[in-house]
Design a protein with these regions (language model features):
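Internal, conserved structured core segments that host functional sites
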Residues: 96-146
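Generic secondary-structure signature for well-ordered alpha-helical cores
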Residues: 38-42, 113, 156, 176-180, ...
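Fold-independent oxyanion-binding glycine-rich loops
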Residues: 21-24, 92-95, 123-126, 187-188
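Catalytic cores of processing enzymes, dominated by hydrolases/peptidases
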Residues: 129-210, 248-251
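Short, solvent-exposed amphipathic alpha-helical segments in soluble enzyme
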Residues: 34-38, 106-109, 200-203
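A conserved C-terminal secondary-structure "cap"
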Residues: 193-271
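N-terminal short beta-loop-beta anion/metal-coordinating cradle
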Residues: 1-93
């Protein structure tokens, strides 16, 4: 393990939860996790050696000089809960590996055992047929029926059957393989906004997470960002509507150039 991760500090908690995040649709997982980490002032304690899990696919060039290959970062952070409840171990990664996701998920859980992690939390986007002005709902899934019953205490939609792509879902599958508790909270995002960050959905997820973890942080900054993002989503909604009209509708009258030709023909007949 020490060859794959470098720890600057190794806390020894009595009990801990893991909050892990990788990039995904709407950047939801990273927004939730980074915001929570920053507000809790969680301390960076280590990072993984990326060579085992990632392969560079190119290089950057600056002033006509090729730079050395760059690897994505995957860092661990730690927050001590002074209220006497469970601490939080964070893992945040810049990228998802192309083909070694299963190995990385197992490795993250190996590290988690070292910190006495009892439950794993991940987050993802749920693409839904909603308008960006609607309040997004939060869906929930878990690794066993007792946790599903636990989620019923909160404002969470239990959809029953769905698929979670990438490490934000795979980590929970591996957690179940290893008989570890795990919960994934998914925020609804409109289908036409999947390519941009969605702080509004992230805010909805974070509100539920804070209730589950029984901790409090200031959400005003994220709420302001979510409000500002509505303008960008409004433009995307208009664009999506225009594309829909172009693709699925036809004009009920002839094009203007056709009308002109028809009028010319009439004039010739009159002569």
């Amino acid at each position: 393990m020490k060859k794959l991760v470098n720890f600057h500090k190794e806390p020894r908690p009595r009990a801990c939860d893991l909050v892990a995040a990788w990039p995904g649709i709407g950047n939801l997982s990273l927004i939730v996790t980074r915001y929570l980490r920053e507000k809790l002032a969680a301390e960076e304690i280590g990072e993984i050696e990326p060579f085992t899990f990632f392969d560079p696919i190119g290089v950057m060039v600056k002033d006509n000089i090729v730079e050395t290959p760059q690897f994505p970062e995957g860092k661990f952070f730690y927050w001590h809960n002074t209220a006497g409840k469970k601490d939080i171990l964070f893992f945040i990664s810049d990228e998802q590996p192309s083909y070694k996701g299963y190995e990385l998920a197992n490795f993250i859980l190996d590290v988690s055992k070292k910190f006495k992690v009892q439950r794993v939390y991940t987050f993802a986007a749920a693409i839904a047929k909603i308008h960006h002005t609607e309040q997004p709902k939060v869906w929930g899934v878990a690794t066993d029926t007792s946790l599903v019953a636990f989620l019923k205490k909160y404002d969470v939609v239990l959809r029953g059957r769905l698929q979670i792509a990438g490490l934000n879902g795979l980590l929970l599958g591996v957690a179940r393989e290893r008989a570890m508790e795990g919960i994934c909270l998914l925020g609804e995002v409109p289908s036409y906004t999947t390519r941009i960050p969605n702080p509004k959905a992230a805010l909805a997820v974070l509100k539920v997470l804070l209730q589950v973890l029984e901790i409090e942080i200031d959400l005003s900054e994220l709420a302001k960002i979510a409000e500002e993002s509505d303008q960008q989503m409004k433009r995307l909604a208009a664009q999506a509507m225009g594309e829909y009209i172009d693709r699925y509708t036809r004009p009920v009258w002839p094009p203007l150039e056709d009308e002109g030709e028809f009028e010319d023909e009439e004039e010739e007949e009159e002569e």
